[in-house]
Design a protein with these regions (language model features):
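Short glycine-rich phosphate-binding loop at a beta-alpha junction
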Residues: 150-166, 281-288, 310, 389-418, ...
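Glycine-rich phosphate-binding loops at beta-strand->alpha-helix junctions
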Residues: 161-176, 288, 292, 314-319, ...
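Conserved phosphate-binding catalytic cores of ATP/NTP-utilizing and phosphoryl-transfer enzymes
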Residues: 1-4, 191-223, 392-403, 455-474
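Phosphate/ATP-binding catalytic cores across multiple sugar-kinase/actin-like superfamilies
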Residues: 134-153, 201-213, 341-409, 428-429, ...
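Early-domain small/polar-rich strand-loop-helix modules and first-structured segments
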Residues: 1-112, 190, 197, 241-248, ...
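Acidic low-complexity intrinsically disordered segments
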Residues: 187, 315-387, 472-615
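Phosphate-binding loop and its immediate beta->loop->alpha context
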Residues: 31-182, 193, 264-310, 316-354
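Conserved phosphate-binding/catalytic loops in two-lobed NTP-binding clefts
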Residues: 184-197, 366, 429-460
Length: 615
């Protein structure tokens, strides 16, 4: 069924947004932003372009009756959005933030009530999955209370929805995102990678003129630095039947590095300033400082005329006024810590620092050890150089781009994410890239003028929905990784040494949505009624492996992901040994499925991702 509305939802780590195109409003529908009603002060609801991805779980009697009331829910006992972010920052043990980052953390049970992470025994907790569901549910309810108020057929649950995810999200994290969306009532769903959505927004913004901004052979880097993650994507411009075409060639590894890290760095900078003045913060005050620093940072980055921004946190005194701690955060301090700390000048051959493993580590989000985004960029481009070297290159520009291709340098960059609203950060990023281009004797790398950095992903997702209906150019790409099942070697056991693990390819890099394949060559023996676990792996750089390819030596090229589990049901056959082979499918939604099929072809069982805590 073709729906009237095509809807794009950006479920962001820091902010979420919705854009839509009304296909019933004319012959040339355009994506536009839906302003989301939300609580901004106790008892006050207003519309905003963005829904801050924060969940406030108040304690008993912390808010007056009706303070959290919404037009569609008079009895709401929690809040998401602007008020949740602003007030919750003052009581951080009752504020859920970065739920999307926790959703992709394989070291915790993502369906267990673990957030807020530092909540006390008396505080309420929710799971990362539940928090993301609540953000999406709020968006669904807000849409239905406005767009679909008088027309039930316009309810969001029955519209075509494009939901974005980081390009670096693995298959398990994508599955959990789909689960959250379906729990919020969204069934007519397709996933889209956020950097691709940003590129679609650029295409939509330029219309047919985009063909005058790029040429055959161009390699566009989409640099997407959001609240929780840094995503790098390479998109190539090629030619097909005389027309320009686009192909997503590569995505980077999952980097838990973004605005959250920057907020913490700014908070420590402010705390150091207070310490010099004789005020030392305790652990609880540092949590408050982190949220207050985020607001101050966003004020400074949003208004280039501001020279400083105020920070206020609660002290330890009984009096609210007398116990207040205030600090003026200078713009110069913010720009110094962000520019030099997160976008340092470095050589093209630079590698990010790796963390030393310690005997005891505090549980928390697995942030990267090195905050230097430019060093991670160098690693990404150099790692992709060899992977891209053997591909079929577009004709006509091979010689011109040879030097850049030899080191996987892009010819253009498209910025995305609120971080890049700050001119100094964009300029430093581009200057570092151009220093590398100069050293490689390549042409200068240009910046493509993007759309609104906060809303581009949602708008691009809505535009992609129109593309799916034949109204624009589509970026080809398929799966962003090749996927593998781990197979232990059959060699004799050696005391003290684990059996070598081989990687069996079950889904090739770039496997398209709506396709499926048998995995030849390998047979597994499973027992009916017993749970079997498969080690699951992925690679962003191995492009030539086909289903059934068995890789012996894959160190540094393939990474271990969340395992997959399957239980063969069938009570009459309990305990019976069943030989099975694997079959893979990428659904139209963009979800990878791996199935076990009995050799006689009569039965099959789906493997599920084990998203519980990994020991």
């Amino acid at each position: 069924m073709t729906t009237r509305y095509v809807v794009g939802i950006d479920l962001g780590t820091t902010n979420s947004a919705l854009a839509y195109a009304d296909t019933g409003a004319g012959t040339d529908p355009k994506a536009k932003t839906f302003r989301i009603p939300q609580i901004v002060n106790p008892g006050a609801v207003e519309e905003r372009d963005l829904l801050p991805s924060f969940l406030y779980l108040p304690g008993a009697n912390e808010q007056p009756a009706g303070a959290l009331k919404l037009p569609w829910d008079a009895d709401r006992d929690f809040a998401v959005g602007e008020f949740a972010r602003n007030f919750g920052g003052k009581v951080p043990t009752r504020l859920v933030s970065s739920a999307k980052s926790w959703l992709c953390h394989p070291g915790v049970d993502r369906k267990a009530a673990i957030l807020p992470f530092r909540a006390g025994e008396e505080d309420r907790r929710v799971s990362p999955l539940d928090a993301c569901t609540r953000y999406l549910k709020h968006i669904v309810e807000a849409w239905n209370a406005n767009i679909a108020k008088a027309v039930p057929e316009h309810r969001l649950e029955v519209q075509e929805v494009i939901l974005t995810v980081p390009a670096s999200f693995d298959a398990a994290a994508r599955d959990l995102t789909i689960e959250a969306a379906r729990a919020a009532g969204l069934e007519n769903l397709t996933l889209l990678e956020e950097p691709q959505a940003a590129f679609y927004a650029w295409l939509d913004n330029l219309g047919d003129d985009w063909r005058n901004s790029v040429a055959v052979g161009d390699l566009v880097l989409v640099a997407d630095v959001g609240g929780g993650t840094t995503d790098f994507t390479l998109i190539e411009v090629n030619e097909e039947a005389g027309n320009l075409a686009l192909t997503r060639l590569a995505v980077g590894d999952h980097l838990l590095l973004g605005g959250d890290n920057m907020d913490l760095a700014v908070a420590h900078t402010a705390a150091a300033g207070l310490a010099k003045a004789g005020t030392k913060l305790d652990g609880g005050q540092m949590l408050q400082m982190t949220y207050a620093a985020r607001q101050a940072k966003e004020q400074l980055l949003a208004d280039a005329k501001l020279t400083k921004a105020p920070i206020t946190i609660l002290g330890k005194g009984r009096s609210v006024v007398s116990g207040t701690i205030k600090y003026e955060l200078p713009r110069s301090d913010v720009e110094a810590v962000l520019v030099d700390g997160f976008f340092p000048e470095c050589e093209r051959t630079a590698e990010p620092a790796r963390a030393r493993a310690s005997g005891l580590q505090e549980l928390g989000l697995p942030y990267v050890a090195d905050a230097g985004i430019t060093r991670h960029l160098a690693h990404f481009l150099n790692r992709q150089a060899e992977a891209l070297a053997g591909r079929d290159k577009p004709g006509g520009a091979k010689k011109k781009k040879a030097a850049a291709e030899a080191i996987a340098l892009p010819t253009a960059v498209l910025f995305n994410g609120g971080v890049f609203k700050a001119d100094p950060l964009r300029n430093r990023f581009l200057n570092v890239l151009n220093a590398w281009a100069k050293s490689a004797k390549a042409e200068p790398i240009r910046s493509l003028a993007g759309a609104d950095l906060d809303l581009a992903v949602a708008r691009g997702a809505a535009y992609y929905g129109l593309v799916r209906r034949g109204k624009g150019v589509r970026i080809r790409g398929g799966t962003a990784r090749a996927y593998y099942i781990g197979v232990e070697s059959s060699a004799p056991a050696v005391p003290g040494f684990p059996a070598p693990l081989k990687a069996l390819c079950v889904a090739p890099f770039g496997m398209e949505e709506g396709t499926e394949t048998d995995v030849p060559g390998q047979e597994f023996g499973l027992i009916v009624g017993e749970e079997a676990e498969f080690r699951f792996l992925g690679s962003t750089i191995r492009r030539d492996d086909k289903p059934g390819t068995l890789v012996d030596d894959w160190d540094g090229q393939i990474d271990e992901l969340s395992p997959m589990i399957v239980t063969l049901d069938g009570k009459p056959d309990q305990g019976r040994f069943v030989p099975v082979q694997l079959h893979s499918k990428v659904t139209e939604v963009g979800q990878l499925e791996v199935w076990c099929r009995s050799k006689d072809g009569k039965r099959r069982w789906k493997l599920e991702f084990n998203v519980r805590e990994q020991k």
